[in-house]
Curated annotation (Swiss-Prot):
The lineage of its organism: Eukaryota, Amoebozoa, Evosea, Archamoebae, Mastigamoebida. SMART domains: AAA (SM00382), MCM (SM00350). Component of the MCM2-7 complex. Its EC number is 3.6.4.12. Keywords: ATP-binding, Cell cycle, Chromosome, DNA replication, DNA-binding, Helicase, Hydrolase, Nucleotide-binding, Nucleus. It comes from Entamoeba histolytica (strain ATCC 30459 / HM-1:IMSS / ABRM). The gene is MCM3. This is DNA replication licensing factor MCM3.
Length: 601
């Protein structure tokens, strides 16, 4: 096509551009079945036995046939003598990440003819060239319906913002740093105190790995992460932050989400009364991230609908005569609260969440986030929050004619193309350089598009040793706790998780090989998520907190004289060497020979 073409989204469609050539960018949310459309209509008059042929190849697709001749004689359609062409309708909606906050995404009906039918399916991101036309509404209403008569369809292959040469140079400089994941993770939700390992996992999830074909079976490359724990531990805030830095993200809430709303639904088209296929959130987020808050509020049946998406990354539809499979190649970031309010460390994650093991094993990482309380930690947290309030940027919302939606402005900023500023201009974190959200988004986009790194021999050995140790740790804990394990299940999927995490870290470094350092980062996150310790057996603050809380409750609240080592090891799920590393840090006395702990005067 030649001449000026308006490049628009469904939100920009107005009466001023009707009957003009446009290029509409959006995502296909609904597709109809293919039906025949009259191309040459042959009509028969039963009074004089005459036939009348009418060429409709250049007429509007919704034109109505006349039922009478010019002199008033009746006409009947002869279907056998008429000719037809293929006809299909799509609904194209503006991109979820570009819709202004607080407003419904807008859509436009697209008409496909002949060779264009079946060129797009729900979930595809497309640019459709065609002509905007107005169709009369029912009952000769003065309002019209806008449709786009397609002339060409291009499927978008790349996601994320456009990178300039300066952006690429800045990204390569960061990749050459000694430990880029530490630099980047500090810039992820900097207003949230702590959770360094969780932020690293989120960064690895955003970058992801490459799906692979292994013995004719597809192995996913997307990383799934769940955040579970006590209320007020910033789980939802982390999800909201991911929405702002992910190149493509769709948000949903478990309280109102249904299985078909997350996957796909077969609905009736009100105009044609035909069955149409409508894409759900996971199909719309193909090659992106799905953030599911209140994951524990979903029903068992709705959560079961996610099993296929999380492992096979497709949505199979077998309803109302429609048999198809839609792509849902997305990562899942879920946040859940324990069923009893606060997380009970004496119970397993399955008992705390009432989730089946088949679902939990599909997550690569499940972080148990507890509301830890020590005097030092509380003081640091309060200082961090107070510093934020002293240095916050005031956002003024004006009402009336000049009303400004601050969040909508933030979303609109995503669409701007240009050099991204590298560092934030803030006085909140003195002495630290934090990357801007725009730069992190471009960094993630660049890393995702790098060639697939190859697995080195040293990394393979590290991953294999770690997997064996994971299984051994789980077996020992099952025996120690009479097969009532307090940690997450270790299945063969954990081995694939280690490989995916290591590959994502290699992409962050810009390396063409997965080295031992990448494997060590992956192993560290897996061990921290499963056992609250690193793979070398070092003690984490959460383990020490568990022991401190148990001893405080038994010796002070329950007024017991002594606590035997065996009771501590059984309740806290640790071994004696670990306990002996923790006890010197606590304000309790202990006798290593007699193996008991007592309250000091």
């Amino acid at each position: 096509m030649e001449g000026h073409i308006h490049h628009i989204t469904p939100r920009n469609i107005t009466a001023s551009i009707l009957q003009q050539k446009v290029a509409v960018q959006g995502i296909i949310t609904k597709s109809s079945q293919i039906r025949p459309l009259l191309q040459t209509a042959v009509q028969f008059c039963p009074l004089d036995y005459s036939t009348h042929a009418r060429d409709l190849s250049h007429a509007d697709v919704m034109v109505k046939l006349s039922s009478k001749t010019p002199d008033g004689k009746p006409l009947e359609l002869e279907p056998g003598l008429s000719t037809y062409k293929d006809f299909q309708t799509l609904v194209v909606q503006e991109m979820p990440e570009s819709a202004p906050t607080g407003q419904m995404p807008r859509s436009v009906i697209v008409i496909l003819l002949d060779q264009l039918v079946d060129k797009g399916k729900p979930g595809d991101r497309v640019i459709i060239n065609g002509t905007l036309k107005a169709l009369a509404g029912p009952n000769h209403s003065s309002t019209f319906k806008v449709v786009l008569e397609a002339e060409n369809i291009n499927t978008l292959q790349s996601e994320g913002p456009e990178l300039t040469e300066i952006d690429k140079e800045n990204i390569k400089k960061v990749m050459k740093e000694e430990n880029p994941i530490n630099l980047l993770s500090k810039s992820i939700a900097p207003s949230i105190y702590g959770h360094s390992d969780v932020k690293k996992a989120i960064l690895l999830m955003l970058v992801g790995a490459t799906p692979k074909i292994r013995l004719r079976s597809r192995v996913r490359g997307d990383i799934h992460v769940m955040l579970c724990g006590d209320p007020s531990t910033a789980k939802s805030q982390l999800l909201r932050y991911v929405m702002s830095i992910a190149p493509l993200a769709v948000s949903t809430n478990g309280r109102g989400a249904t299985g078909v709303g997350l996957t796909a639904a077969v609905v009736n088209d009100p105009d044609t009364n035909q069955r149409t296929l409508e894409a759900g959130a996971m199909v719309l987020a193909d090659r992106g991230i799905v953030c599911v808050d209140e994951f524990d509020k979903m029903s068992i049946e709705d959560r079961a609908a996610m099993h296929e998406v999380m492992e096979q990354q497709t949505v199979t539809v077998q309803k109302a005569g429609i048999h198809t499979a839609l792509n849902a190649r997305c990562s899942i970031l879920a946040a859940a609260n324990p069923s009893n309010g606060n997380y009970d460390v004496k119970k397993s994650p399955m008992e705390n969440l009432y989730f089946p093991e088949s679902l939990l094993s599909r997550f690569d990482l499940i972080f148990i986030i507890l509301d830890s309380s020590t005097e030092e930690l509380d003081r640091r947290l309060s200082q961090h929050v107070l510093k934020m309030h002293r240095h916050f940027d005031a956002l003024t919302e004006q009402r009336g004619d000049d009303e400004v939606n601050v969040l909508a402005l933030v979303d609109a900023e995503r669409e701007k193309i240009g050099d991204a500023p590298v560092y934030q201009d803030t006085s909140l974190y003195e002495g630290e350089k934090l990357f801007t959200n725009k730069f992190i988004k471009k960094y993630v986009t660049y890393a995702r598009n790098l060639p697939t790194p190859s697995l080195s021999e040293s990394a393979s050995e590290t991953i294999a040793d770690a997997y064996v140790k994971l299984r051994e740790n789980e077996r020992l804990k099952r025996i120690k706790h009479n097969f009532k394990i307090k940690t997450l299940p270790i299945t063969a999927r954990a081995l694939d998780s280690l490989i995916r995490l290591a590959e994502a870290h290699a992409r962050i470094r810009g390396s063409d090989t997965i080295d031992e350092i990448d494997a060590q980062v992956a192993v560290q996150l897996i061990f921290y998520a499963h056992f609250d310790e690193n793979w070398e057996g070092n003690i984490t603050t959460d383990i020490a907190r568990k022991v401190r809380e148990y001893l405080t409750n038994e010796l002070i609240a329950e007024c017991k004289d002594v606590i035997q080592f065996d009771d501590i090891l059984s309740i806290c799920g640790i071994d004696k060497p670990t306990l002996m590393k923790i006890l010197p840090q606590l304000s309790f006395g202990y006798d290593e020979d007699e193996e008991f702990v007592y309250k000091q005067n």
